[in-house]
C-alpha cells in the first residue's frame, strides 16, 4: 500500500460516503472553468492522494456499497475532485481488476476523455461491464472557453468508438447549442449505445471565478426554457433537477420521489415527539418551497432556507449543506428540535469541514435529528 493512514482515512471516507474510488490527486490541467479546485479552499481539509497501488484498490473495494450496481474509479466529490482517472499509469489495469472483482456491477470512469489513449479502445471495448461516463460539456463554439484543453478531435473519436455508459451535456445558456449537441449525439447514434444522455445545469458559489459566474447565471436564467424544449423534443434525455418545481418533472424523477419519501419520514418523526415540541426543518434552496408547502398546515413546524455558500453544484433534495452556512443564516426564535438532511454528514458523521453534529446541538442548545 502507498497510502498512509491519513490518506487512507480520506480515501475510505470518499468511497463509503459517495461511492467514488479516488485513485490519485494529480491536477489534470485541463482547466475546466467550473472546476472547484480554483476557489473552494475547504478542499484543503482533505489530504492529497498519491497514485494508489493494487493493494490500496483492493482494500478500497471493501468500502463500496453492496446495494448499488456500479463502481466508479477516478475523481471524488471531496477527495481528489480535480483529477482525471486516465492520468493514473495503472488505470487500464485497475479497470480490468475492478471488472473481474465486481462482475455483476458496472465499472465506470468519469472523464472529459482528454487522456484516454485511442490505442486502448479495443481493450476497453472487450470489458463487458465497463463504460465511460463522458463529460462532453458541449461540442459547440463555447467548448474551448469552458474547457481550455478540450481535445475536440479525441472527444469525437470517443463518441464514435468508445464504450460509453453515460454522456453528459452542460447547458451553457444557449438553447441552440443544446439542440446542436443533441442532434450530433443522435446522428452518431450515441443514444443507442449509452445508458443515459444527461443535460445538467451549471452552478456557482459566491467565491467562484467571474467567468464561471457569468456562464452559470446565463445557464440558470434559461434552464427552465431549455428543459421544456428537451422534454418535448428528446423525451428520453435525462436532466438534473436543481429545484423541485413541476417544470422539472419527467427527467430525474427520483428527486421528487425522494422528496415525498423524506417528507413522509419527517412527518413520522414529528408525530413521535412530545406534544408542543417546536421543530425547525433545515432546507436547502433546491427543496425549500416544496417542503414549505408540504408542512404548511403544521403550526409547530417551520421550514428554514439555508443557502449553500460553501459548496456549489449540489442538486439533491437534501443538498450538501454544512454547519458554517447554518450558523451564519439560521437564528431561530424558538428551537426545540432541528431536523437536518442526513446527507450533510459523511460516513464518519462529520460535515464538510469535519464537524460532528453534536457541535451544532451545543451551539443551538437543541436536539438534532437526521432525516
PLM regions and their residue ranges:
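Conserved strand-turn element in the central/C-terminal portion of the radical SAM core barrel
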Residues: 139-141, 158-185, 197-216, 246, ...
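Well-ordered, non-membrane alpha-helical segments in soluble/globular domains
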Residues: 50-60, 87-96, 148-157, 178-186, ...
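Helix-enriched interaction subdomains in cytosolic or periplasmic regions
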Residues: 209-261
Amino acid at each position: 500500500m502507498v497510502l498512509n493512514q491519513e490518506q487512507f482515512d480520506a480515501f475510505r471516507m470518499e468511497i463509503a460516503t459517495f461511492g467514488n474510488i479516488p485513485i490519485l490527486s494529480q491536477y489534470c490541467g485541463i482547466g475546466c472553468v467550473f472546476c472547484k479546485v480554483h476557489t473552494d479552499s475547504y478542499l484543503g481539509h482533505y489530504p492529497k492522494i498519491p497514485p494508489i497501488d493494487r493493494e490500496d484498490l483492493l482494500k478500497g473495494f471493501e468500502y463500496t456499497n453492496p446495494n448499488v450496481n456500479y463502481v466508479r474509479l477516478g475523481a471524488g466529490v471531496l477527495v481528489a475532485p480535480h483529477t482525471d482517472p486516465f492520468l493514473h499509469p495503472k488505470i487500464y489495469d485497475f479497470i480490468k481488476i475492478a471488472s473481474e472483482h465486481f462482475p455483476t456491477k458496472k465499472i465506470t470512469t468519469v472523464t472529459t476523455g482528454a487522456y484516454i489513449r485511442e490505442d486502448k479502445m479495443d481493450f476497453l471495448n472487450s470489458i463487458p461491464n465497463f463504460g465511460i461516463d463522458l463529460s462532453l460539456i458541449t461540442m459547440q463554439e463555447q467548448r474551448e472557453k469552458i474547457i481550455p484543453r478540450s481535445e475536440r478531435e479525441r472527444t469525437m473519436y470517443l463518441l464514435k468508438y468508445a464504450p460509453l455508459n453515460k454522456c453528459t451535456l452542460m447547458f451553457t445558456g444557449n438553447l441552440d447549442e443544446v439542440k446542436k449537441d443533441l442532434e450530433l449525439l443522435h446522428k452518431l447514434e450515441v443514444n443507442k449505445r449509452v445508458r443515459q444522455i444527461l443535460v445538467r445545469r451549471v452552478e456557482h458559489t459566491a467565491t467562484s471565478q467571474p467567468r464561471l459566474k457569468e456562464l452559470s447565471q446565463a445557464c440558470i436564467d434559461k434552464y427552465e426554457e431549455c428543459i421544456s424544449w428537451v422534454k418535448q423534443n428528446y423525451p428520453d434525455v435525462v436532466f438534473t433537477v436543481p429545484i423541485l418545481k413541476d417544470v422539472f418533472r419527467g427527467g430525474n424523477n427520483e428527486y421528487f420521489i425522494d422528496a415525498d419519501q423524506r417528507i413522509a419520514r419527517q412527518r413520522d418523526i414529528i408525530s413521535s415527539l412530545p406534544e408542543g415540541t417546536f421543530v425547525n426543518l433545515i432546507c436547502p434552496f433546491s427543496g425549500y418551497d416544496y417542503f414549505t408547502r408540504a408542512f404548511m398546515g403544521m403550526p409547530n413546524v417551520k421550514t428554514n432556507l439555508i443557502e449553500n455558500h460553501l459548496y456549489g453544484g449540489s442538486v439533491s433534495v437534501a443538498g450538501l449543506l454544512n454547519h458554517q452556512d447554518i450558523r451564519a443564516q439560521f437564528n431561530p426564535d424558538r428551537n426545540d428540535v432541528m431536523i437536518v438532511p442526513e446527507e450533510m454528514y459523511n460516513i464518519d458523521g462529520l460535515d464538510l469541514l469535519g464537524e460532528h453534529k453534536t457541535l451544532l446541538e451545543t451551539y443551538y442548545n437543541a436536539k438534532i435529528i437526521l432525516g
